[in-house]
From Swiss-Prot:
SUPFAM superfamilies given in the database record: Metallo-dependent hydrolases
Keyword Nucleus tagged: no
Cofactor(s) demanded: a divalent metal cation
Keyword Secreted set for record: no
PROSITE patterns registered for this protein in UniProt: TATD_1 (PS01137), TATD_2 (PS01090), TATD_3 (PS01091)
Alphabetical UniProt keywords: Hydrolase, Metal-binding
One MF annotation (Gene Ontology) recorded for this entry: metal ion binding
PANTHER family according to UniProt: D-AMINOACYL-TRNA DEACYLASE
Residues given in the record as a divalent metal cation 1 binding sites: 7, 9, 95, 206
Similarity field: Belongs to the metallo-dependent hydrolases superfamily. TatD-type hydrolase family.
Record lineage: Bacteria, Pseudomonadati, Pseudomonadota, Gammaproteobacteria, Pasteurellales
Cofactor-binding details, from the entry: Binds 2 divalent metal cations per subunit.
EC numbers on record: 3.1.-.-
Name of this chain's protein: Uncharacterized metal-dependent hydrolase HI_0454
Organism: Haemophilus influenzae (strain ATCC 51907 / DSM 11121 / KW20 / Rd)
Amino acid sequence: MFIVDSHCHLDALDYENLHKNISDVVEKAHARDVKHLLAIGVTLSRFEQAYDSLREFNNVSLACGVHPLDFEEEPYDAERLLRLAQDPKVIAIGEIGLDYYYSADNKAAQQAVFGSQIDIANQLDKPVIIHTRSAGDDTIAMLRQHRAEKCGGVIHCFTETMEFXKKALDLGFYISCSGIVTFKNAEAIREVIRYVPMERLLVETDSPYLAPVPYRGKENQPAYTREVCEYVATLKGVSAEAFAQITTQNFERLFKIRVE
């Protein structure tokens, strides 16, 4: 079985208590058939800091972008993002988007940074990885306004409504399932995942956050993508092996790579 963790924050895991190093994390994942990881950036400085420790892994791809909750950490620099994202190891622009749940007093600034990053993704022909929270209408509006259907992308860690999902699918976007789908109170999300065609689904951990059942409350890690894969496979009425193959093919199609 070959599973891809399509979204993890490898620089944020607990290397003091739980893991020796990134190689340890990658090996634990591989032992559970999670054989390719997409490591996500949230600021450009943090991306640069993590780059040297990640570039040596053939089974780890990178995404570079500025997260809506982190964009005020340093001045947004579109030229710097463009330069960093041209690296062939970088297969996506992300994680980018809008978050009004934690920060609603800077909507205009969030939107400006988000729009700029979609434009860069289109310029480079690399997909976008979208974070959206309490901002569904504006997220869809901006994806349309900036022609995000050209570069394509994924709604990561999906927690939105059926209406949002249909609009995202209409734009050609993929939907990614995280550990949240296993939570007891996530029936509305499960309903959407049942609706979404299997050819448009990805699986992820969003490590170190949102560990799936039975690890809920503990630090998440890429190895636990297997739990997400098995759970969603059952939801879709297929074997875990078949679902792993489908979601791996989806990952390759969206990000225009062959994984190893």
